[in-house]
């Protein structure tokens, strides 16, 4: 098959699989579906990835790469903790809203259990991000001298849950536009977390 030699890279396979997983769901998408969408033979697909689980792992890993690059690395250099947190909310929300980064949606939506060694690696990266957010919230609480009613951990889970659920209902042509959503979510979070 001529297409076998034209396939750009593993990234093209991952982008296509992410699109299919997003549209159909992980369980409803077969390796045949992915191969067909790429105009590859099944053998050509297996040359790059041994299993659908391996594809899902790489999609989730790429989603974490995107989060680290576009959120964590983007805010690390901001010295003021409150401004750093405001920017984190903005950047994380923009990542979730980005249609280009289907990997994020797949990671947020798919609860299919990966094989334990792969799941452990993804979970470790997710925990690192949660701790980063939690520590930043604690730092803002110290600077603002809040009364400590809201724990940084509970606030981190609330913030991430609030932002990560957006992909379920947000429509670019809807009543809430991205910038307005960023402002409102930031206001809601700051009003509740820093009493």
Model region roles, listed by residue range:
Residues 6-8, 12, 16-54, 58:
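Helix-turn-helix
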Residues 23-27, 78, 99, 143:
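Short coil/turn segments at alpha/beta junctions that flank glycine-rich nucleotide-binding fingerprints
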Residues 27, 146-147, 176:
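Conserved hydrophobic residue
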Residues 52, 59, 63, 67, ...:
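Hydrophobic/aromatic residues within well-ordered alpha-helical segments
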Residues 58, 72-100, 156-159:
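Hydrophobic alpha-helical connector segments
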Residues 65-68, 106, 116-142, 153-157, ...:
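Amphipathic alpha-helical packing segments from all-alpha helical-bundle domains
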Residues 91-95, 131-139, 160-162, 168-195:
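C-terminal peripheral helix-coil segments that are non-catalytic and often amphipathic
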Residues 97-117, 134, 168:
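Amphipathic alpha-helical segments used for helix-helix packing
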């Amino acid at each position: 098959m001529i297409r076998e030699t034209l396939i750009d890279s593993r990234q093209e396979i991952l982008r296509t699989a992410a699109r299919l997983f997003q549209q159909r769901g992980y369980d409803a998408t077969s390796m045949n579906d992915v191969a067909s969408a790429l105009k590859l033979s099944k053998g050509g697909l297996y040359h790059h990835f041994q299993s659908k689980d391996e594809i899902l792992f790489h999609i989730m890993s790429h989603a974490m790469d995107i989060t680290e690059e576009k959120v964590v690395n983007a805010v690390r250099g901001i010295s003021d903790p409150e401004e750093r947190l405001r920017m984190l909310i903005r950047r994380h929300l923009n990542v979730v809203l980005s249609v280009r980064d289907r990997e994020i949606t797949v990671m947020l939506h798919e609860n299919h259990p990966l094989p334990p060694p792969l799941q452990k690696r993804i979970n470790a990266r997710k925990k690192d991000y949660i701790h980063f957010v939690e520590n930043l919230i604690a730092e803002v609480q110290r600077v603002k001298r809040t009364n400590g009613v809201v724990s940084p951990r509970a606030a981190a889970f609330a913030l991430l849950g609030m932002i990560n659920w957006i992909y379920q209902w947000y429509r670019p042509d809807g009543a809430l536009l991205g910038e307005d959503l960023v402002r409102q979510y930031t206001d809601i979070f700051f009003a509740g977390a820093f009493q």
